[in-house]
């Protein structure tokens, strides 16, 4: 009997996936936080002094302090008016939502820091791999993102602007498009 129940459940699950109902809908709902916004999602730090706490509230200890406004962080969880964030180094903790902004920024290839002197992320005039390079960004450089088309992001940094491959930045998901 147990074998039949398993087999019936398996057939039902496969049918639900193939018809686009059930499991797919549950996943779409699970991707939204209590705020109604998607989880995870990228935002930036609004203030130049932001305490990262070990839990969602001022009663929790501060584990880190960010000292630069505009840094990109990823919201991975929500609780009341607190957001659990992850930074480009993988550090996680909680911050009050009032210290976050919907503005977008990214860090050029933080995973390439310290890999050598001639490692750069090319910023291009157009969103094409053959387009003219307008700047060479060192890994770890902060850029402000204006839009992404799913493969490329239009970004600005001190004295330069252009298109950067989404695969070479931390601050936009692969395939994510926005203006």
State what each model feature region is.
Residues 16-25:
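C-terminal segment of classical bacterial N-terminal signal peptides
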Residues 46-55:
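Acidic/histidine-rich, surface-exposed loop or edge segments in extracytoplasmic proteins
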Residues 79-81, 148-151:
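Short, charged beta-turn/beta-strand-edge "cap" motif at the junction between a beta-strand
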Residues 1-12:
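Bacterial N-terminal signal peptides that target proteins for export
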Residues 83-86, 146:
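A structural feature that tracks compact, well-ordered secondary-structure segments
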Residues 52, 121-124:
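Bulky hydrophobic/aromatic "packing anchor" residues in well-ordered structure
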Residues 29-42, 57, 65, 74, ...:
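Boundary regions of SH3-family modules and the immediately adjacent low-complexity/disordered segments
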């Amino acid at each position: 009997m147990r074998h039949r129940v398993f087999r019936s459940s398996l057939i039902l699950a496969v049918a639900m996936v193939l018809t686009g109902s059930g499991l797919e809908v549950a996943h779409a709902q699970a991707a939204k936080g209590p705020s109604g916004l998607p989880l995870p999602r990228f935002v930036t730090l609004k203030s130049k002094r932001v305490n990262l706490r070990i839990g969602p509230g001022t009663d929790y200890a501060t584990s880190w302090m960010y000292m630069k406004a505009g840094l990109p962080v990823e919201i991975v969880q929500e609780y009341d008016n607190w957001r659990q964030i992850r930074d480009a180094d993988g550090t996680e903790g909680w911050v009050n939502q009032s210290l976050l902004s919907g503005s977008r920024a990214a860090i050029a290839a933080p995973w390439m820091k310290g890999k050598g002197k001639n490692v750069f992320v090319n910023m291009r005039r157009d969103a094409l791999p053959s387009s003219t390079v307008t700047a060479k960004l060192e890994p770890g450089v902060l850029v402000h993102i204006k839009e992404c088309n799913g493969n490329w992001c239009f970004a600005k940094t001190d004295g330069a602007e252009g298109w950067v491959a989404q695969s070479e930045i931390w601050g936009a998901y692969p395939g994510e498009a926005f203006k």
